[in-house]
Amino acid sequence: MSRRVDNKGKPVTAMLQVQAVHRDKTQVVELKKTTYLPYLFNLVLPKMFYQSTNRIVMARLYPDVHEHDKQAAEYFEGFQTPCFEMPASLFPGEVPMDKFVFMPTVMLPMGFEAGGVFGPGVLPRRSYPIDLMASGHKGPTPPLFVGLSSLYVKLNSESESCLGNGGDQPASNVALVYATHPCKHTPKDSKELMHSNDYSLSIAYNLPVPPTPPSPYPLRPAPVQYNIYTPDLSNVHMLMLRQRNLTVALLSTVNHPHVPAVAFATMGDEECPKFELPSDVFPICEGANRPIFLPMRFLPKGFDAGCIFKPASLSELWFVNHIGRYGTPQPQLNCAITPPLFVGKYRRGTKAVKILKEIQMECERKFSQSAQSMEEASLQADEPKTPTTQGFMVMETEQQTPPKGAYCLESYQEASDTGCVVKVTKEEATEAADTQEKNELHPINVETEPEDRGEAEDRKKYLSCFKVDSDIDLITEAMADMGTAEMRLLAKEEALPGVDCARALDQLRQVLEGRGQIRSQADQLIQDHIYRMDRNRMLALRQPIRMCSGCGMLH
């Protein structure tokens, strides 16, 4: 048994080759009245299926794509259709072979001399081919096509060019490209959004970003899941041929991955501008397939509102009818399901960005940097650098032993090399002012001995460094032990253009002083979020039980 491979990353119907079978040309059967008879002439298989000696092919069908042709079923009722003997070992268990419908020759896929279908829910789950149905599939079993391929197959030139040599290559686990199929509508009655005056079809483009160095705090990659999909599109440019109120763009699960922070922001914590989707174009999706509206800070530039349809929420038939041949292929982690879709409301009066000029300038800048680095390159081998935890705050104390949670440094230059950005010293001006005020109230003439004065001048200062992930309570306790502490930036303000140093220090001071209040507020926000989720869950459980439109079962 050989498994199917992907044809250049294009989404094709899942298929299996089973075994070789010989058929007599005179074998026919009468077509009876049936409730499922699809038109499969346009179903094209990878080239390996036509070149193999295994003639029986099984293919999973989708009811929303391969619909029942009622007129053909009524017309061909009573006609003689070609048939073949189904091997007993083809399906395990008891299979209702009397419900298998052999199809007329004109409705069979190209390259088949006989074949038929099991309708939706006809095959038991234990008898359905394991490789053609997901383990978590719910509802009735999908329809299944079982056909007998011809000994000598001659495909037309269009199918040959479409297949190419993609079927001869083994399948890989890398990201695949989802490509939409062209629809057969004429421009006059076409449903494609490219021909509409109310919508525009955009291309989601990401500017190339320079590679970032490895972080000393590597984050665990988020597992691939499609129960929720909320990408960050703030740095994504939408390329459109014409400006319209609404624009539609295919997204990529590789270039636009799911961001958990965006998902938390959409759960009622931030305001998400919404708009009404036209019902004549977009289907009514409820529950887990509903469109997710994004907050303003995660939208592309120039958009007032936007929503995301997660992967597999829209049917392939919708993409065929409304996107068609104008869809730009995007790399996907899973090409067996439909890609995610962005629908955005464009801001009126926004000036379009000359994206091509911006891309050209970005490429020229990167080329000049690479050329300069090549000129300055030396033959000396670089020593491997072990990523270390960056410093955060250097503290000047009079005690040789560093505070709890800190470590010693020799100089401010070492602190700067470590990555310290804040310098904390004991504020001497306040003590001098208090002493002067006390002497004015109670004048005492005391002569300072030269030895004591020399000891005060020669008093040594010790430097202690706190890491960026040090305990904030330990940092605050060390500053409290100093008495009156003064915070300053270690670097000069001239070296930080565009940074409000005073405001940054003031915000750090507020965090250190009000850390308890910040923690209580964050805890209260989490408790409020838990309460909202529990309330919504209880409201959902109180809803009346209805029949699911996807699987036909009661939920």
UniProtKB/Swiss-Prot annotation:
Keyword Repeat among record annotations: yes
Domain of life where this protein originates: Eukaryota
Compositional bias of kind Basic and acidic residues: 430-441
Keyword Phosphoprotein set for record: no
Region (Disordered): 430-458
InterPro entries reported in the protein's UniProt record: DM7
Assigned keywords, A-Z: Repeat
Record-stated family: Belongs to the DM7 family.
Full protein name: DM7 family protein GE17493
Annotated organism of origin: Drosophila yakuba
